[in-house]
């Protein structure tokens, strides 16, 4: 995405580290815009972005492996400060004439370094705890570099070429385990790259409105409303930018939460005076999904059918050229890049037909979920709408595991409504980042009254997170869980067992499909 010249930016190049998105987050938390891009990005593209600094992420490979990831060495001649992290430091060393070799043993975990009073470590104590994760080590630094930190296992825990403003650290400052990691990154971003830290949601709105108006001109836009927070924020942002040129199409695919369809029409159609067309397409989606149990196939079908519905509706309108979606930055990252295996196809990223008749507008595809909520508040959307539970584009279609039926949808819909009601009553809405129920499709034996039952199991998923990239299961009080379980088995037909998901992300994803 080409950024406006007046916006300061730190470019992060991706070498496949599990932590690379954390680098981007940490920088944004400092009020400086940052984007993650593939390491193969061209010099010309980098110049267009006009970054204030470049960070080379870590990665799982060795710089000497065949086909290992690399960059155009011209990056070091752009006159822009560069910080290499772990693999990024080793690659910098190799490309600029130093030596890297395989370590006798992998260094993983906490380590103590001794740092010099340098720009990168400005204002920090000499002795610091850092997080190491590497199997190669630098044994000779390039000409013009000096060591600015060492540890018992390496004389080159951090290096710098002060004249060219090129830096490297053998540890991960972006993770919480590194004691002064945020301070080190802040020193690079604010002191070395001279960023002012003025990136705010207010500024984002101004820049995005300008870009939307420039892209759209006097043409018309369709906004895909799913009922979730993301598409709702996109709709309000677009309406602020282009007013009546926007038509929102709310596809009621029969995969929504209880009462959601009516809520969308009331809150956004009437509350924001937006032009919303509600399309009842339940039968159409259910026909396409009949007999389909593979989660990837379900996502693709739902994504395709969404666009086909828009095609049908657009044909009834005149001069519509654009389709707007609520794609998030996490969607883009998780759908895979050259250095990351696809975890799952996101509805707003994969599943779009090649012959789609619209040009896409994705105004929040550089934002994380918490940033989207902040954007929603800045746009004037009421807090109770902004803090609604995250809801995937495929809706309950991926919370019914396996083949979707009307009966299974109703079970998930009713159990989810009970869960949300109890969480709200207990005042836990802000403490738990996301919570929902799933229907695994398995049956088990139970006893209700004097009768043996053989009915479905409901799974409860509740997690704490900041941005959805990583998460932990929520420690909900047992009495609250018991209340939820009791209500579900007593009030929802065909359910005799409730289980609680206690896995983190990773290794699991938040959604079950």
From Swiss-Prot:
Keywords: ATP-binding, Glutamine amidotransferase, GMP biosynthesis, Ligase, Nucleotide-binding, Purine biosynthesis. Its EC number is 6.3.5.2. It catalyses: XMP + L-glutamine + ATP + H2O = GMP + L-glutamate + AMP + diphosphate + 2 H(+). ATP binds at residues 226-232. It is an enzyme of class 6 (ligase). Pathway: Purine metabolism; GMP biosynthesis; GMP from XMP (L-Gln route): step 1/1. It comes from the Bacteria. GO terms for cellular component: cytosol. Pfam families: GATase, GMP_synt_C, tRNA_Me_trans. Residues 199-388 form the GMPS ATP-PPase domain. The active site is at residues 86, 172, 174. GO terms for molecular function: ATP binding; GMP synthase activity. Residues 9-198 form the Glutamine amidotransferase type-1 domain. Homodimer. Catalyzes the synthesis of GMP from XMP. NCBIfam families: guaA_Cterm (TIGR00884), guaA_Nterm (TIGR00888), PRK00074.1 (NF000848). This is GMP synthase [glutamine-hydrolyzing]. It comes from Staphylococcus carnosus (strain TM300).
């Amino acid at each position: 995405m080409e950024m406006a010249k007046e916006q300061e930016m730190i470019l992060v190049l991706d070498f496949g580290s599990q932590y690379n998105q954390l680098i981007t987050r940490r920088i944004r938390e400092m009020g400086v815009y940052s984007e993650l891009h593939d390491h193969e990005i061209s010099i010309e593209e980098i110049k267009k972005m006009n970054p204030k600094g470049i960070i080379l992420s870590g990665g799982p490979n060795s710089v000497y492996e065949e086909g290992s990831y690399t960059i155009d060495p011209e990056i070091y001649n752009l006159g822009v400060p560069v910080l290499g992290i772990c693999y990024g430091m080793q690659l910098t060393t190799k490309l600029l004439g130093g030596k890297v070799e395989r370590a006798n043993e992998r260094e993983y975990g906490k380590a103590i370094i001794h740092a010099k009073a340098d720009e990168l470590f400005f204002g920090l104590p000499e002795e610091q705890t850092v997080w190491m994760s590497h199997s190669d080590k630098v044994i000779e630094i390039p000409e013009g570099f000096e060591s600015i930190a060492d540890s018992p296992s390496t004389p080159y825990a951090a290096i710098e070429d002060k004249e060219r403003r090129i830096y490297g650290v053998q540890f991960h400052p972006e993770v919480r385990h590194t004691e002064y990691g945020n301070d080190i990154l802040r020193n690079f971003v604010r002191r070395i790259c001279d960023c002012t830290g003025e990136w705010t949601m207010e500024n984002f709105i101004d820049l995005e409105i300008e870009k939307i108006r420039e892209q759209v001109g006097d043409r018309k836009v369709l906004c895909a409303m799913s009922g979730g927070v993301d598409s709702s924020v996109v709709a309000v942002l677009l309406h602020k930018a282009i007013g009546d040129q926007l038509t929102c199409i709310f596809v009621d695919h029969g995969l929504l939460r209880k009462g959601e369809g009516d809520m969308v029409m009331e809150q956004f159609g009437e509350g924001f005076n937006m032009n919303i067309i509600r399309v009842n397409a339940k039968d159409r989606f259910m026909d396409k999904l009949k007999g389909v149990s593979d989660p990837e196939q379900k996502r693709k079908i739902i994504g395709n059918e969404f666009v086909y519905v828009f095609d049908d509706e657009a044909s009834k309108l005149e001069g519509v050229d654009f389709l707007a979606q609520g794609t998030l930055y996490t969607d883009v990252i998780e759908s895979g890049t050259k250095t990351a295996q696809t975890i799952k196809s996101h509805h707003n990223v994969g599943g779009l037909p090649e012959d789609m008749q619209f040009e896409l507008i994705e105004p929040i595809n550089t934002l994380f979920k918490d940033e989207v909520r902040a954007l929603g508040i800045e746009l004037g959307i009421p807090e109770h709408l902004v803090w609604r539970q995250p809801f995937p584009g495929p809706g309950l279609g991926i919370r019914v595991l396996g083949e979707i039926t009307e009966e299974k949808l109703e079970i998930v819909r009713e159990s989810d409504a009970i869960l949300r009601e109890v969480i709200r009553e207990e005042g836990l809405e802000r403490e738990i980042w996301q919570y929902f129920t799933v229907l695994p499709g398995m049956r088990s034996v139970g006893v209700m009254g004097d009768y043996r039952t053989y009915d479905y199991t409901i799974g409860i998923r509740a997690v704490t997170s900041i941005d959805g990239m990583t998460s932990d299961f929520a420690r909900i009080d047992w009495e609250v869980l018991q209340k939820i379980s009791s209500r579900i088995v007593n009030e929802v037909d065909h359910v005799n067992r409730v289980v609680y998901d206690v896995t983190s992300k990773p290794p699991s994803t938040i959604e079950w499909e």
